[in-house]
Regions:
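Bulky hydrophobic segments
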Residues: 1-104, 108, 112-136
C-alpha cells in the first residue's frame, strides 16, 4: 500500500503477524536452548542468569508486540510459567541439565523489568485521563 508521498506503508496487522512469528520463533529457540546439552546451546552471555534475563526480557517485549490486546499481567504470568516449565524439564533425568530455582527468578525479574516501563506509561495515561476506576 502506498501513502500520499509514494512510500510503502506496512499495515499494522502485518506488523502484528511478524511480531507473532518472531515471538513464537524466540519461544521455540529459548526452549531448545534450555534442553540441549550446554555445549550445544547458543551462549548469549558469560553468566547463566544474564542469559535468562536477556531471553525473557526479549520474549516479554515480543509478546507485548505480538499480542497488543493481551493483558500485561496475563502475559507476565504465562511467560513466568514458561520459565518454570523450562526448569521442570531441565530437572528430568533424560535432559541431563540441572534445575535451578534462581534461573526462574532471573526469568521473572526480566519479565517485570520489561513490563515496568509499559505499566508506567499506562499509569500516566490513566492519571492524565482522570479515570476513577481502572481495569487491572
Amino acid at each position: 500500500m502506498l501513502n500520499p508521498f509514494g512510500r510503502t506503508v506496512l499495515r499494522v496487522s502485518l506488523l502484528i503477524r511478524l511480531a507473532q512469528v518472531a515471538f513464537f520463533g524466540a519461544l521455540m529457540f529459548t526452549f531448545y536452548s534450555a534442553i540441549v546439552p550446554p555445549a550445544l546451546a547458543v551462549q548469549l552471555a558469560p553468566w547463566d542468569k544474564a542469559e535468562h534475563f536477556i531471553a525473557f526480557y526479549s520474549l516479554t517485549v515480543l509478546a507485548v508486540a505480538a499480542f497488543p490486546g493481551g493483558h500485561l499481567l496475563v502475559i507476565a504470568a504465562l511467560l513466568s510459567g514458561f520459565g518454570a516449565l523450562i526448569e521442570f524439564v531441565q530437572g528430568l533425568s533424560i535432559v541431563h541439565r540441572d534445575r535451578d530455582f534462581w534461573d526462574w527468578v532471573a526469568d521473572t525479574i526480566a519479565i517485570a523489568s520489561a513490563l515496568a516501563p509499559m505499566l508506567l506509561v499506562w499509569w500516566r495515561r490513566v492519571v492524565a485521563s482522570g479515570q476513577k476506576n481502572i481495569d487491572i
